[in-house]
Design a protein with these regions (language model features):
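Conserved core positions of repeat-based scaffolds
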Residues: 57, 95-98, 107, 145-148, ...
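Short glycine/serine- and acidic-residue-enriched loop/turn motifs that recur at repeat junctions
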Residues: 56-75, 108-125, 159-175, 209-225, ...
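Surface loop/turn motifs at the tips and blade-to-blade linkers of beta-strand repeat domains
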Residues: 80-81, 130-131, 180-181, 230-231, ...
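Tandem repeat domain/solenoid detector
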Residues: 85-88, 101-104, 135-138, 151-154, ...
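Enriched but not universal
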Residues: 1-58, 397, 401-409
């Protein structure tokens, strides 16, 4: 007997072992589960983690961003509460929004534009639930706004909307989630500084929000307050945005493993060997083994299917991880490791997890966002403690000044 999950994935009633897998960073070695579960989670539509997850945080604690009931910055990881049912998390500038395994949505930190989604503009230093719904599946944070996909394939947004990044056809900020259109075929979403990229189940790519650097990929620099399609291709897979202080760019991997970038490029963050801005997607090299690309403040970090990590763009704080503070306009490899499982790119720093469930960090560290117990920048990866129980790093955190990661209890 068999059936289908939403999205067309085959459902098996007989258990199959999935292990080791990397659903979205979560290792499930030795866990009995349905086949395709990892792929389902990787698309952001699987609401439950494959293993129990504690949520840990560190870095800039302004406005309660670390969820500790205070505004203290921490240079070493601290746990957010005592729960072990966290599933997904994304960071904004000084805010955090997370999804639990029961599909509920929680938020804390800066709320000046309603980016916590709780109907107010009051900062929260501890997690508060956003509404009572239990169908949240995926989350992505921009500078002071968030977007989320529900299990029914609808897309929602809230927070700051000065460039139309909430996709409402206006520039009004919202302190509670509002639906973007009426479609139910959204698959993946990524957010940059003040813009959004989203892929539908048909593989088409859509963008909206700020566009002064061409970050929407529309061949122009016109802002859009409603979703507009990028070209006519149906082969887009994993979207991500990056940027800070009005310099934004975008990255997306296609289903064939090629990497494409566009937008601001003043420090080589597009990885195309120059510093020329591009308002339409351009391919980064000719390789077909890219897995994911992430953007930050004028820099990018990408992971390949062979487990290597590559970076490009700004590096004045060592965020390229190549042992220098020199900008690079073409991808450079971070060390020689081939065991990177997933990465997260913050404002000017990177967090990476290996297949051995160790956590590493590098780049800017002025408020302890590297989790190393100090505030010294690092230009090469340094291990965060000695634990081997990290099972997932954060998702979207392109504008964040703090960090989060998951541990197995």
């Amino acid at each position: 007997m068999s059936g289908k999950w939403p999205g067309g994935f085959i459902k098996k009633t007989a258990p199959v072992v999935v292990g080791p897998v990397d659903g979205e960073g979560g290792t499930a070695s030795g866990i009995w589960t349905l086949d395709q579960a990892a792929d389902y989670e990787k698309q952001g539509l699987w609401p439950k983690p494959l293993v129990p997850r504690e949520l840990w945080t560190w870095g800039n604690g302004a406005d309660g961003a670390n969820g500790q009931g205070n505004t203290t910055s921490y240079s070493s990881p601290v746990q957010v509460g005592a729960l072990t049912d966290w599933s997904k998390v994304s960071l904004s500038y000084k805010s955090t929004v997370a999804i639990k395994s029961d599909g509920t949505l929680w938020a804390w930190g800066d709320n000046g534009y309603g980016q916590l989604g709780d109907g107010s503009t009051t900062d929260r230093s501890s997690p508060v639930q956003v509404g009572a719904l239990t169908d949240w599946a995926q989350i992505a944070g921009g500078r002071e706004f968030f977007t989320s996909i529900k299990t029914d394939g609808t897309l929602w947004a809230w927070g700051r909307n000065n460039f139309g990044q909430l996709g409402q056809g206006n520039t009004t900020s919202y302190s509670s989630p509002v639906q973007i259109g009426a479609l139910t075929d959204w698959s993946l979403v990524g957010a940059g500084n003040e813009h959004v990229l989203a892929v539908k189940t048909d593989g088409t790519l859509w963008t909206w929000g700020a566009n002064d650097q061409g970050e929407l990929g529309q061949g122009n620099t016109t802002d859009y307050s409603s979703p507009v399609q990028v070209g006519a291709l149906t082969t887009w897979a994993t979207p991500a945005g990056g940027g800070e202080t009005g310099v934004s760019h975008s990255l997306c991997v296609k289903t064939d493993g090629t990497l494409w970038t566009w937008g601001g490029n003043g420090q080589g963050q597009l990885g195309i060997g120059n510093t020329t801005y591009k308002s339409s997607p351009v391919q980064v090299g000719a390789l077909t083994d890219w897995s994911k690309g992430l953007g930050g403040d004028r820099g990018s970090a990408c992971i390949k299917t062979d487990g290597t990590v590559w970076t490009m763009g700004r590096s004045d704080s060592g965020e390229l991880g190549d042992g220098t503070t020199v900008d690079k306009s073409s991808p450079v490899q971070v060390g020689a490791l081939t065991t990177w499982a997933d990465i997260s790119r913050g404002n000017r720093f990177v967090i990476g997890r290996t297949t051995g469930n160790t956590l590493f960090s590098w780049g800017d560290n002025d408020t302890g966002m590297l989790g190393l117990g100090d505030t010294t920048d690092r230009s090469s990866p340094v291990q965060v403690g000695a634990l081997t129980t990290w099972n997932k790093s954060a998702g979207e955190m392109s504008n964040a000044l703090h960090s989060v990661a998951f541990q197995s209890p």
